[in-house]
Amino acid sequence: MSKSNINDAGRRPAPALSAARIDNDVQAIAAATALADKLRPQALLRDRERILPWDEIEAYSETGLGAITVPKAYGGPELSFVTLVRVFEILCAADPSAGQIPQNHFGVLALLHDLGSEEQKRRFYADILRGERIGNAGPERGRNAISHVTTRITATADGLRLTGRRFYSTGALFAHWIPTRAIDDEGRAVQVWARFDAPGVSVIDDWSSFGQRTTASGTVEFDNVPVEPVQVLPVWQAADRPGLWGPISQLIQAAIDSGIARAAIDDAIAFVRDRARPWMDSGLERAADDPTILHEIGRLETDYQAAQALLHHAASVLDELSAVPVTAETSAKASVAVAEAKILTTEIALDASETLFDLAGSSSTRAAHGLDRHWRNARVHTLHDPVRWKYHLLGNYYLNGAHPARHQWN
């Protein structure tokens, strides 16, 4: 475990000076595909040895992918949410841990779009266009609901000061900016953007989950950290201001699960085709000719295609709704569309990563193959927000017309 602004190897986020410019959807998909080709070869080793993807994340920044949702009014390409989803699917099929690290980056940018002032947008969008990364200092540890916040930002004679301890801080170790939820002197929820190298900021690499092992989603401590007013976003206004930041954040989470499912199915197909033996009673020479296996591969592919179709539909809904002023009804519509997709991507990620072993057989469990990482990654990531509450959200909307609560998990 390491503590302070560096990890065990002494790495710090590099100055963001060399980000490429992406101007259209085709360039974004090409950049994601090329990056995925770099992520894939060592993904198993990084998972097994818990090697943090520093070089890979710096390579991600250099592609310019981190700026693809920056609005055109602020110098960005403002690409579609369908493209954003495809980028995450491509990256997470190659390495879902490295692919998840930018998730909070885009979720926070969506919040900046909805709640940020003009000064804040000009400041932070410019940083992103230069290639800087946004992390996250997530919910606090303990038995309280994740909405419970003890982190405080207070006004002092020397300016604003941030104090607290947060966990589930995916991306923070690699980030230039570390936003966190805090309560201000008036008891209101705000989001505070702390600079990674600000005095009093400590990132602790204590993430020890059995899946998504290299996201470095551990602890961040803020000890009387100095911040400027421009670094404080009024999250409390979200309750009365319809927006899309919650659905956008959830959309990316669903895309991560879609990528995990794709990787599991691809590995199942490859193992059955190249390594698996036929069952003795089948009378076949190849496992790939077993009708029960053919049935299951067909079922997995069908379920995956259905989940992906609903995911891309949800992204299209967000593209449509983001082009016009957001109302309470359209904000709810966005949350519903994404919840429907999130259910199916969760279920196919878990199903595919489990069924893989039924189809591939005992030899597929050898540690050398590392196929268990698909299930471990799917199981850990899908716990981010329980599907049972997505079903509840949908039932309450369709039966009672109830709008989903506005937060990053809806």
Segments the model singles out, each with a brief description of its role:
Residues 209-304:
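Glycine-rich beta->alpha junctions and the first turn(s) of the following alpha-helix
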Residues 55-62, 68-170:
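Glycine-rich flavin
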Residues 358-410:
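Glycine-rich phosphate/cofactor-binding loops in nucleotide/flavin-utilizing enzymes
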Residues 44-47, 305-343, 357-362:
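C-terminal helix-coil-helix/basic helical segment that borders enzyme active sites and/or dimer interfaces
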Residues 1-102:
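Amphipathic, small/basic residue-rich leader segments at the start of a protein or domain
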